[in-house]
Amino acid sequence: MKFSQATILAIFASSALVSAAPANIVSEQTMVKREDVNAIVELINEIKHINQKRDLAEGEDLLELQRRADSVIGELVSALYNSGVIGLVWDKLTTDPSISSSLSNIIKSAIQGAIVQGGALIQAVWNSGLLGDVFNKLINDTDLRQALLDVGKALFNSAANLISIWLGGSSSSSSAAPAAAAAPATNGASKREIMEAAEYLSERDLASILSWIVQTIKDTGIVQSLVNQVINNPDTVISFLTSALKNGLVIVEDLYDWAKQSGLWDQALVYIQNNAGSWIKALAGLFGNALSNGTITASDINNAGSSSKPTGTTTASTATAAPKAATPAAASAAAPKAATSGSSSGSSSNNADLNALINKYGGGSGSTSTPTVDTSGLSSDVNTLVNAAGQAASSLKKRKLY
């Protein structure tokens, strides 16, 4: 398939814009089909045509043209999404200073009005690498701190399990798709031959088209309509918010305040509790760091969330991430002396947790080659697990040298 005439004209029209575009906006790995770009260009040209007719219309004709424009914009959103270029378009729009204020206001209204759902918001936060910033705000917010601790209890069940995953638990995503990284064999064909045979755009042509798409979206005045449709679409809003956060269009402080006003963080925490499988290692790290710096205590985790119960999905994910420390029963099995005690006091439970860590990370053998954990002087308070965890981490590093 060759370029449509509209696409060819778009490439020529955008040639002057390419030199001004960021050089790294399109990578060599970005593969987009010509037919998908043809569809995008044709939809944008249809919007331009509708706008021209709308300038001369009135009454019912004007309303019909407006309805048609809204429909075509919706089709454009789908075409951008399905082609795989929507993230690139958002990156260019969210870094454009001429529309940054307008976009920021749209996002603010959508979050304050709870048009965006908490699950979509927290996914965008995760994708943009800002989960740690949001976690720190939640854990230091007296209104939401306990809700976050309840999620920690639901995910990890105890401070001992949390520390176990933090220090040495294998991530469920670490071996999820190792084979997928291998590209299909090309039998020695050049990149140009592959691209021509598969009808994919070259890097240069794609950069030209993207510049034209973004400039035309701005010139036709559909930025607000486009973004509003995206925000109302759960399939596309995550990509848009990710770009807005990653590129600094919206800062964490503002986002946090807006979402708190509309109750979105409560929704986000529910989403985390029910869908944290691939995040479990990162979450263990955030909670673990909070334990180590004294922001929270092990008792905060152990005593949290009597009403928060892990769902089946959460339990399975946690078990996958750290099968040896998934349940209190597993910890008891690792420390028979503590488990067989008839006492139900907090001291017995804490000792069982501590012994589980010692058995997991060393300390039972007298061999000089086996790293040990010094537990002398430790009280029965489970908060001392944090100190033991630090020693365990050091022991793990030494063990890997042998």
UniProtKB/Swiss-Prot annotation:
It comes from the Eukaryota. Glycans are attached at residues 140, 293. Residues 304-322 have a biased composition (Low complexity). Keywords: Glycoprotein, Signal. Residues 1-20 form the signal peptide. Residues 302-322 are annotated as: Disordered. This is Opaque-phase-specific protein OP4. It comes from Candida albicans (strain WO-1). The lineage of its organism: Eukaryota, Fungi, Dikarya, Ascomycota, Saccharomycotina.
